[in-house]
Amino acid sequence: MGKKTVYLDNCSYNRPFDDQRQLRISLETQAKLYIQSLVRNEKLDLIYSYVCFYENYINPFENKKLAISEFFKNAKYCVIESHNVIQKASEIIKNGLQPLDALHLSCAISAKVDYFITVDDDILKYSTDELQIFDPVMFIKHWESMGGKDD
């Protein structure tokens, strides 16, 4: 299996800081941390964007902001704002998604990422042929079914 690319939105980056007493949140956190280990171990290439950077920049919690910024250093590429990104985001917004969510998706599509990871239910309902959208747990199931290994 060739190296694949992954894009995580800010909901995913912040998941480990959410209330872990809730089962869904705890499972998604464990899966998200596993995805991070795949990136750190160079099994997946991380792509992020100016939207990730912006949302993290305005995060009022310094400890979260710092941890997420540190992980961005693992990225192979950062998608910057462009006419095409804005235009695609406008199309996505017409399908009912919020502007920042649409920008995340548009950036991922622009970078031709293989996998978009989110814990946002509205994004998970969005359908496109341009990339695969997963929550962290479903991504791990998919990754393993495709022969992905962490060793």
List the predicted regions and their residue ranges.
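Extended, non-catalytic scaffold segments that flank or surround catalytic motifs
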Residues: I35, K76-Y77
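Short amphipathic alpha-helical segments and helix-helix/interface helices
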Residues: K32-S37, I68-S69, L105
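Acidic, PIN/NYN-like endoribonuclease modules and their adjacent C-terminal/linker elements
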Residues: M1-T5, D19-T29, I109-D151
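Anionic, Ser/Thr-rich low-complexity intrinsically disordered regions
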Residues: S12, K43-C52, I58-P60, K64-F71, ...
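PIN/NYN-family metal-dependent endoribonuclease catalytic core
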Residues: Y7-P60
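HAD-like aspartate-dependent phosphatase fold
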Residues: K4, N14-P16, L44, A67-N74, ...
